Amino acid sequence: MKRNIFIGLILSVIFCQFTMAQSNTTRIRHMVVFKLKHPKGSAEEKDFLIAIKKLAAIPGVEKLECMKQVSKKNKFDYGLSMEFASQQAYDQYNSHPDHVAFVQNRWVKEVEDFLEIDFELPI
């Protein structure tokens, strides 16, 4: 009986260490849906969407996609999705000068409304 308890404790410790190691390498998917202040189809709208794609040049950004909403199920017109190899990579992106400048100079001024959500992705 004591042997079984000991083996159970050892397996629990190994599992916890494995889980903790995985949490340090968990991928992150950052998603935002948004509505612009610009008229649909305008040059300003197109310029904003081009500017978003430049965020892909920031170190750590993977799989950046900017998508157009096709249904009337909500008030948002566009979606943005990108992935990061880790929480650390995502944190570095958030504080990167190019991202901060984009948010201050474009996002705050040109986005009417948005919803942001971040997911852990299974490894």
Predicted regions: what they are:
Residues 61, 103-118:
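Conserved short beta-strand edge segments in small beta-sheet-based binding/regulatory domains
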Residues 13-78, 85-92, 118-123:
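Short S/T/G/P-rich N-terminal loop/turn motif that feeds into the first structured element of a domain
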Residues 8-9, 35, 105:
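A periodicity- and composition-biased signal for non-globular, repetitive helical segments
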